[in-house]
Amino acid sequence: MEDLQLVLFVLGAIAIVAVLVHGFWSIRRQQPKSLKDSPMGNFYKKQAERGEGAPKRVDADGFDADGIGAVRVRKANEAHTPEAPAFNPYLKQEAKTQPQPVEPVQVEPKPLFEQEPSMAQPDFSLQSPTAKEQHRGPKASRQEPVLQGHSANLAQAHVGQSHAAMVAQKVAEEQRAQVQMPTQTALFDDEEPYEEEQSQAVEQADDDLGEPRDVLVLHVVAKEGQQLNGAELLPCFLTLNFKYGDMNIFHRHVDNAGNGKVLFSIANMVKPGIFDPDNMEQFSTQGVVFFMTLPCYGDALMNFSIMLNSARQLADDIDAVVLDGQRQPWGEFTKQDYLHRIRANA
């Protein structure tokens, strides 16, 4: 048993040594051979030793059999002089002549139309009718009516008239400013007839309605012990197609978009009777007043119907009460009185 162990120990040692030797041999074989061990390492040295006494064969250009010539040393600061190109007899080079500057030729301008000596020079040029039309320029269009100014004299308020009626009277005076059509002289003799017809139509459409003879007033007031908040009034005004404008109050125009003539307006019932849209959230009042002047633009009965419906709609939205011009509850008797006043001033 001991002999078997000894044999195995020896075999293991031999195997280990064999593996180590094989590893070193593989590593050395994979490494590149140095210049010293390479077969071409001493090639140039031996060749030089053999040819020391023998003369080297050099061709006409100074190169030996291996293509090596004499070593030439050049200075670093030596200027490089370009060599002249060799002459090629097969290429014919033509001498280039520099073009001489040519003096500019002065051409005298000639008149487009030669005039005869006997004919006098006219002061104006003759042109065709078409040319006249082109030089005439655009015709001036009719100007829109210009508001001359607002009347400064307000009608005296009646005794006992409320502040809302006074505001309505003032706004009515502003809306009934005198409208005049400026007269414009014709620039040309061939003015078209249809332009005159259009001018007359505009003048008839913009005729002044005259001084207001009556004012229809409706109040929308808060219930007892309450007030109307500006944060609630502003969206209601916009929903009813009112637009903030002149006199710092809201107006209802012919067009729902806020264009055209003013039909009726809304003012603050408390002095000074104006609104500030930028501070409506901090604004509160006891009520607002609707007013319409007579005569008015369009159908007065239809305009009053729109104003009455707007007042009722506003009262329903903000939980308020509709009153007449004397701040009395709106009823059938008051309605008939307003209709009679509308017919009287139609």
From Swiss-Prot:
GO BP annotations listed: division septum assembly; FtsZ-dependent cytokinesis
Residues spanning the membrane: 7-27
Annotated protein name in UniProt: Cell division protein ZipA
Entry membrane topology: Single-pass type I membrane protein
SMART domains: ZipA_C
The family this protein is said to belong to: Belongs to the ZipA family.
Subcellular location(s) per record: Cell inner membrane
Keyword Zinc attached: no
One Pfam family in the UniProt entry: ZipA_C
Gene3D superfamilies (UniProt xref): ZipA, C-terminal FtsZ-binding domain
Residues in the Cytoplasmic compartment per record: 28-346
Cysteines joined through disulfide linkages: none
InterPro entries according to UniProt: Cell_div_ZipA, ZipA_FtsZ-bd_C, ZipA_FtsZ-bd_C_sf
Complex formation: Interacts with FtsZ via their C-terminal domains.
Record function comment: Essential cell division protein that stabilizes the FtsZ protofilaments by cross-linking them and that serves as a cytoplasmic membrane anchor for the Z ring. Also required for the recruitment to the septal ring of downstream cell division proteins.
Keyword Secreted: no
Positions on the Periplasmic side per record topology: 1-6
Region of interest: Disordered: 76-103, 121-145
Alphabetical UniProt keywords: Cell cycle, Cell division, Cell inner membrane, Cell membrane, Membrane, Transmembrane, Transmembrane helix
GO annotation, cellular component aspect: cell division site; plasma membrane
